[in-house]
Regions:
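Hydrophobic helical membrane-anchoring modules
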Residues: 37-50, 220-283
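Short, well-formed alpha-helical segments that are part of the catalytic scaffolds
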Residues: 58-77
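Acidic donor-binding segment of Leloir-type glycosyltransferases
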Residues: 72-108
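Conserved donor NDP-sugar-binding/catalytic core segment of glycosyltransferases
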Residues: 141-169
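Short aromatic/hydrophobic "clamp" motif used to bind/position activated sugar donors
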Residues: 129
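Conserved nucleotide-sugar donor-binding
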Residues: 125-126, 191-204
Length: 283
């Protein structure tokens, strides 16, 4: 992992000497976790050893994602926990709880991306919380960055750079626009793998449980609280929606929904319109 990627920090860069020292300590102290907690209501509060839990990863899921098993494999780590929050009454997502790695928990919540994320945050034991969508890929460098950041214990929040995977040439420019916009405005999108120190979320009453636009809402609340980090580290996600629904049509609709939300449209109203289209089933 490159340790010079802590860039674009509001309030000044994190001390690079601390990052280097702590990354060595993390590597030296890593070991296997034998905890397997698959449950619906109450999380396990203790670990089989005395080492502190560094990072909690929350993954909301609703339906099958071809990449889901690969994502869980990439997140298997003794120094982080993964909380999969499946929408109640939804179809299985492709992995049976008894086959999960030891650091994965499987819980259920009413179908609502914000609500599922909020439920995952409540079950999380780590002080740094990372929200990933089920179709995210290429997360190894981002995970290493957050493990080091978590050990510093600083009240920060932020996101990573997004890369959109697909065949349409415009996906590169959409991703660049998303990254630039969020870097300048601190209004982020969930596809960018947003992360939060628990203390910062607590200042704004926790993660918003609304059904849509939860990423915009939490960004608005967190602006000016803690330090905003936009490391130049990419994670990838599918550009399927742009290719499936039409590139320019999708760009226009996404901007329109965001504008309507900023102008006062409710998240419930926008959710009903968005998911009223049968092709938009994946959370």
């Amino acid at each position: 992992m490159r340790l010079d990627l802590c860039r674009d920090v509001v309030g000044g860069p994190i001390n690079q000497r601390e990052l280097k020292i702590l990354s060595v300590l993390i590597a030296a102290g890593a070991g296997p976790s034998h905890t397997c907690d698959v449950m619906q209501n109450t999380p396990t509060k203790t670990r089989p050893d005395s080492r502190p839990l560094l990072l909690s990863v929350v993954v909301p899921v609703k339906s099958v994602s071809p990449n889901f098993a690969n994502l869980l494999g990439a997140l298997e780590d003794s120094d982080c926990e993964v909380i999969v929050v499946q929408a109640q009454d939804s179809m299985p997502v492709g992995s049976e709880p008894q086959h999960l790695a030891g650091n994965v928990k499987w819980i259920f919540a009413p179908p609502s991306r914000g609500g599922q994320i909020a439920a995952g945050v409540k079950h999380a034991r780590g002080d740094l919380i990372w929200v990933l969508h089920a179709d995210s890929t290429g997360v190894d460098h981002a995970k290493g960055y957050l493990k080091t950041l978590a050990s510093l214990g600083q009240p920060v929040w932020g996101r990573f750079d997004i890369q959109l995977l697909g065949h349409h040439a415009g996906l590169v420019w959409v991703a660049r626009a998303m990254n630039l916009r969020s870097r300048l405005t601190q209004i982020c999108t969930g596809d960018q793998g947003m992360f939060f120190h628990r203390s910062v979320l607590q200042q704004v009453g926790g993660y918003p449980s609304q059904r849509l636009m939860e990423d915009i809402e939490v960004s608005k609340k967190l602006r000016g609280r803690g330090r905003f980090l936009a490391p130049n580290i990419p994670i990838s996600t599918s550009g399927e929606r742009w290719e499936r629904d039409g590139f320019w049509r999708t760009v226009a609709h996404m901007w329109l929904w965001r504008l309507r939300y900023f102008l006062g449209a409710s998240a419930d109203q926008l959710y009903d319109e968005y998911y009223g289209n049968p092709s938009r089933e994946r959370l």
